[in-house]
Amino acid sequence: MPPTPPPELDLLDTEPEFAEVDPTARYGRYTEVLGKGAFKTVYKAFDQLEGLEVAWNQIKVGDILRNNDDLERLRSEVRLLKTLKHKNIIKFYNSWLDKKNNNINFITEVFTSGTLRQYRIKHKKVDVRALKKWSRQILSGLVYLHSHDPPVIHRDLKCDNIFVNGNQGEVKIGDLGLATILDNARSAHSIIGTPEFMAPELYDEEYNELVDIYAFGMCLLELVTFEYPYCECSNAAQIYKKVSDGEKPSSLAKIEDPEVRFFIEKCIAKASQRLSAQELLMDPFLRDDGEKIFYPLQSNTKASDGAGSSNSSMGYKYDRDASSMAIREHTGSFAEEHPSDRYIHSTMDPQAAAGRIITVESQMKDLNTIFLKLRIADSTGHAQNIHFPFDIEADTSISVATEMVVQLDLTDQDVTAIAEMIDAEIRAHIPDWALEESVENQGDERAHSETDSSEADDETSELRNEPNATHNGFVQEHLPSGHKYWSDSPRRNIEMSHSAVEPHIGGNMPNGILKKNDTDDTVSNLGTSVDLPNPSMIDRKSGVASVSTSPQSFDDEHIEADVSERLVNLLAQQQEELNVLRRKHKADIEVILKGVPEEHREETLTRCRLKADERNRSDKP
């Protein structure tokens, strides 16, 4: 009687047999289906030579090919796939035509975690850093495809065609069976793709590789919102109408993080304004934290002693609790992530390192708007983020910096430092931005800031009483200037937790900060008592408030009114002169850009501005 075989052999005997073998007998296909699309079915398979599990992709030729031209096109694309070698492009091993069964088969690497869409649905809590890593990998693959001559266009990029190895955090672009090579005119002439991810120019049948950037933006939108783009539409015709009309998916408005939203908007912008994959890879949004620049500021030590000084609500989007949101800006230990000896850009004071450190980043939204991000970290490693748009036509660095100082409990001297950093960021995008503008307008902004505080007091009081919109723990509030911001620390809670700032000497300070109990005629603003101008001190003609530094200052109302009116007239005239000069500069630029194709003007202007800024910096002693 033969001996009983070990259990391991029984398991081997139960292994499924190959349903099909390739002509070389190297690859065997199982019946297990890994995925299925409109034209293609993906089976689990095995490479007997290397001992690897692989994916067997099978396309029914009769389903998509009607003539020899179509067949030759697919053959050429399959041959193309064999030449693609990149870490973020799916590996292609072999292919052949099965005339008997009317199939085209090709073997690719298999992925343990399925598609990016499946992976994202499975893992609900993903940090924004992970999304950035995925984005960098996808864009890296697109850079490789688009750098071919002529470029390779995917034309059907979506989360269902991006694959994941979850144990390595690795993503790769796949399903390149629909890719095409651009002709000599560098444009394609066929509509192929998924409507939700198709750029407007695809419908016009005149497009280039930038359609993949649009699709990438829609992929990122789906990853952030868990919604298919244009899910509000019930059919492809409705999607086509919205896309043709320039209407963005409704899910875009649901994104709370303004940085994420603006980055997606860059990707799905009009073709003439859309950035390339290489340009997007260099975008500040995707930059590693190690590339950030840190500016130490002299902190208000009196204010920092307050119990809640590191948790105050500051700016338009504030992330305090790093564990409270699934997709968020990481605010972990600042000391561990960003050693100050490597990243400090400039130092105002030898003791500055013991105070707050601020990171300044910027993104150009359009010709008139720059999105600024300030990250403030204290000596304990706690960090706070402020996001706000800067309108180069309406805002000045001094006005924004003055408001920030009040919100952040910094010293009055820090106004100039913050303004200079804002100016530096703006000049990175607009080299001819007038540095002296902030100095010239400083007096005007300071004078008006007092009036604005007085006039806006009633308005902000009403806003505080209104039911605020709440989403994911963030409460929408308003600054005195009218700007909106979002905070997970409602204003009234902060007012109760912060101690008021005391001046270093007795009496009224020049910046209007009073000692506690010096007067009851103050309004608490994020822990800082700000002296509001007395209505009688506001000139009725000019509306400019004068803040007295001593009881005897400006006793003569006529002198005050005369000085105020003359000063306002002068500042208004200077501002108009700057506006005229800015308009002239803009017109001069437009004249030169007429020699550049319209779809390349924005890209050319941005590139030349950066070069001009580099030249200006190199010319400085």
From Swiss-Prot:
It catalyses: L-seryl-[protein] + ATP = O-phospho-L-seryl-[protein] + ADP + H(+); L-threonyl-[protein] + ATP = O-phospho-L-threonyl-[protein] + ADP + H(+). One of its GO terms (biological process) is intracellular signal transduction. Keywords: ATP-binding, Kinase, Nucleotide-binding, Serine/threonine-protein kinase, Transferase. ATP binds at T108, E109, V110, F111, K158. Residues 28-286 form the Protein kinase domain. InterPro entries: Kinase-like_dom_sf (IPR011009), Kinase_OSR1/WNK_CCT (IPR024678), Prot_kinase_dom (IPR000719), Ser/Thr_kinase_AS (IPR008271), WNK_Ser-Thr_kinase (IPR050588). One of its GO terms (cellular component) is cytoplasm. Its EC number is 2.7.11.1. Gene3D superfamilies: Phosphatidylinositol 3-kinase Catalytic Subunit, Chain A, domain 1 (3.10.20.90), Phosphorylase Kinase, domain 1 (3.30.200.20), Transferase(Phosphotransferase) domain 1 (1.10.510.10). It holds the Pfam family Pkinase. Residues 438-490, 501-520, 527-553, 600-621 are annotated as: Disordered. The keyword Chaperone does not apply. The keyword Kinase applies. Belongs to the protein kinase superfamily. Ser/Thr protein kinase family. WNK subfamily. This is Probable serine/threonine-protein kinase WNK2. It comes from Oryza sativa subsp. japonica.
